[in-house]
């Protein structure tokens, strides 16, 4: 018999840096999950993605056990790293804050493919290019 799902929720946690402080501790504690067990498992799974915030979907079962699925880092984090900037433009139509190449765009699209609602690389590149435009990042050849 399958375990009954009690709750499912999403968090964004820095890779390899999950600890019992907010937002992780309160989110797990109020659902009765062993916080340290989650932190150890998450940190072990994400230690190779350091420097990114990792979206994670946590499913809690009736016996207080849990499973979690990590997603790819947000497209904006990948774009900021590729462009070498700290944050996007406050006015992306007028102020361009960085540039990325077509090759970098394709690499980001390939990385994000499992999380995007497309299986076509060209469509994924267009989605990422839209994120670039809204951040004030130019795409150059």
UniProtKB/Swiss-Prot annotation:
Recorded family membership: Belongs to the universal ribosomal protein uL11 family.
Gene name for this UniProt entry: rplK
GO CC field: cytosolic large ribosomal subunit
Name this protein carries in UniProt: Large ribosomal subunit protein uL11
Superkingdom assignment: Bacteria
UniProt keyword rRNA-binding, yes or no: yes
UniProtKB keywords: Methylation, Ribonucleoprotein, Ribosomal protein, RNA-binding, rRNA-binding
Organism taxonomic ancestry: Bacteria, Pseudomonadati, Campylobacterota, Epsilonproteobacteria, Nautiliales
Signal sequence, renumbered to the chain: none
Role, per record: Forms part of the ribosomal stalk which helps the ribosome interact with GTP-bound translation factors.
Pfam family, one: Ribosomal_L11_N
Subunit architecture: Part of the ribosomal stalk of the 50S ribosomal subunit. Interacts with L10 and the large rRNA to form the base of the stalk. L10 forms an elongated spine to which L12 dimers bind in a sequential fashion forming a multimeric L10(L12)X complex.
Keyword Ribonucleoprotein: yes
NCBIfam families: L11_bact
An MF annotation (GO) of this entry: structural constituent of ribosome
PANTHER family (alphabetical): 60S RIBOSOMAL PROTEIN L12 (PTHR11661), LARGE RIBOSOMAL SUBUNIT PROTEIN UL11M (PTHR11661:SF1)
Biological process per Gene Ontology, one example term: translation
Post-translational modification: One or more lysine residues are methylated.
